[in-house]
A protein has these predicted regions:
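N-terminal secretory signal peptides that target proteins for export/translocation
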Residues: 1-4
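Hydrophobic alpha-helical segments and their boundary regions
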Residues: 6-10, 106
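Bacterial N-terminal signal peptides
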Residues: 9-18
């Protein structure tokens, strides 16, 4: 009987994660997709997602987690970023095939391109990801917050060291300076799986983000933790690739 209840508890925990406001990659696979639009076509893409695409994703077993646009920098005004959840990598493959073959999707895509012309400047970039063991559950995004996508590329064999730094010191120090992590993910496919960490940070505002990073960089606890972690060499091969994001109006509500 005890074993039976343990099994039921595990099933219920999985359902809560998948049906509620968050999803763990351990219960499936997460996919980040980045769409680059032709000049002036981002709102056409947003219209298609808002009115049709998200519903069709759910129809084919893909769970919408969060959607953003870049709020500044070279990708502002032409790029959509989003995260979806799949039951498994095989399920993802089937879902995308079924979605692409769906007559409803074909009609939507045809109608939007007849109305607006070519919308995407290039094929979408897809990154399948797994959560780090210290990551919060991937969750929906708030409209009134500022988000920051940070992509870290480590030096050779330094990804475990970066994980340790963030797990043991970084995360608690981020919180102490008003920054809240939405998730830490590692790509599942080589070569990125061995040297890349994807991190999204939630800030109360863009100005708050600037102030928080300034305070963190001056914090002796962070300076010492980083120096200790890099005693045998730099962790990062290059500076983090950073994009500030704003949540779009059709992103699932928390």
């Amino acid at each position: 009987m005890q074993r039976r209840w343990g099994w039921l508890a595990m099933v219920m925990a999985t359902l809560v994660a998948l049906l509620g406001g968050s999803a763990r990659a351990g219960e499936g696979v997460l996919e980040m997709r980045i769409y680059t639009c032709e000049p002036g076509k981002l709102e056409a893409l947003n219209e298609r997602f808002r009115n049709h695409t998200m519903k069709l994703f759910e129809k084919h077993g893909m769970k919408n987690i969060a959607y953003w646009e870049a709020s500044e920098g070279p990708t502002a005004g032409n790029t959509l970023y989003y995260i979806i959840h799949h039951a498994s990598r095989e399920a993802a493959k089937k879902s995308w095939a079924d979605f692409q073959a769906d007559p409803e999707w074909k009609a939507v895509a045809k109608a939007s391109e007849e109305k607006y012309g070519k919308i995407l400047a290039k094929p979408p970039k897809a990154i399948y990801m797994t959560e780090a063991d210290y990551s919060p559950a991937s969750e929906k995004a708030y409209l009134d917050k500022s988000y920051e996508l940070r992509i870290y590329t480590t030096a050779l064999d330094k990804l475990p060291g970066l994980h340790s730094l963030l797990k043991e010191d970084g995360e608690k120090l981020f919180k102490s300076h008003g920054m809240r992590s939405s998730g830490y993910w590692t790509p599942t496919d080589e070569p990125k799986s061995g040297n890349t960490l994807i991190h999204i940070v939630e800030h109360p505002s863009r100005e708050a983000a600037k102030e928080s990073w300034k305070k963190l960089d001056a914090d002796r606890r962070w300076i010492d933790a980083k120096a200790k972690a890099e005693a045998n060499g730099k962790l990062l091969a290059v500076s983090p690739d950073t994009v500030y994001l704003k949540t779009v109006d059709y992103s699932p509500k928390p």
